[in-house]
From Swiss-Prot:
It comes from the Bacteria. Pathway: Cell wall biogenesis; peptidoglycan biosynthesis. Belongs to the MurCDEF family. It holds the Pfam family Mur_ligase_M. This is UDP-N-acetylmuramoylalanine--D-glutamate ligase. The gene is murD.
Amino acid sequence: MIPITALKDKTVALFGLGGSGIATAKAIVAGGARIIAWDDNPDSVARAQSAGIATGDLRQADWSQFAVFVLSPGVPLTHPQPHWSVDLARAAGVEIIGDVELFVRERNHIAPDCPFIAITGTNGKSTTTALIAHIIKATGRDMQLGGNIGTAILTLELPCADRFYVVECSSYQIDLAPSLNPTAGILLNLTPDHLDRHGSMENYAAIKERLVAASGTAIIGIDDAYCQAIADRLHGAGIRVVRISKEKHLDRGYFADGAKLLWAQDGEIDEIASLEGIGSLRGAHNAQNALAAIVACLSAGLSLEEIHAGLKSFPGLAHRMEQVGRRGKVLFVNDSKATNAEATAPALSSFPQNIYWIVGGVPKAGGINSLTAFFPRVAKAYLIGEAAAQFAATLGGAVPFEISDTLAAAVAHAAGDAGNDAAPEPVVLLSPACASFDQFQNFEKRGDAFRDAVLALPGVMPMRGES
């Protein structure tokens, strides 16, 4: 735990008592502050009370006593409309912050020079965060991993000079962290997302920009117009910007050419790494993730040799192009995290052909219409869930398909068909391009069910992160 000593002897209001909210409340109290915490869910309030956290309805509180108001990132700050607690804080002139801001202030207070790498972007941030953490940890350095990736940031160990922090930040967390100042900040990409919470794409992009704007080194993917503009703007403001691209050959910066990762400067181009044979980093989207990780680790003082070793041993993340197993030459890949067509596109682009594609669930707007360019790579599609009829109409005569209905049936049929394929490496790919809620609690449960079904097949050899 990181006790928040910067608030010692002050009184703090807190709203949102989920897992990170309770962890935040405990850290505030451990630092010597008083707290009054609340949540709209009575069960959450009861859990906090049983954990020894002082609670009270903030609608009845005297807001003049509060030094700050700590808001959980899942609670609306601005859109679609501010939560009632936000309105009360603003009316009283009380500053509104989140748990990442508390970490930043405590780090600034007790160990301002400790390495702090923060990662954001619409897609790829969890993989990039996990990859950086893996590379650093593999060298034997003291590494702490947290934030939006699933570990509440204030549950980490106390900041000190030689302890590395690798923190994934959502737009909600950045919006509540005005002092965010990582030694290296990464902005991977920007596409429309969470606009219900930010009001417009421009607002969303402006929030994401804050993470890199105050970074010692701003590492920015420039393959979309928003990030390109941010990189140009920050460079013009005198900030150290390192550009990365998975699509463009750069005159200055880091870019991918297939599996080769290259560095260009002053007319010279050097190969700095290769992802050839690293199954957990297959695909152009992972080339971008790897480029960001390499630059961040170099900026933190790691050697290329250390980075290469970490890349090769990276196991990948569950449900994100996770290599589950092999049966003979057939590879089974779990990409259950792909809950829309935009997220499925990198998976389909990662294999040149002979894809046995399991797709479906609760469809998003546009369905799989945007994926038609990848249809020639698909040997057969196996349609599951509510989207089956809609996707069958989209596939038409372009791709052979069957309506499998259930994931278990799809796995069995796809495994059989792929096993009869004469290609060198047919792949059974779960990349649903849909939400999971028609058949599963969440994408994790769907991915677990896929993994279980694959590993139950006769002759399957389990694997994780191998080529």
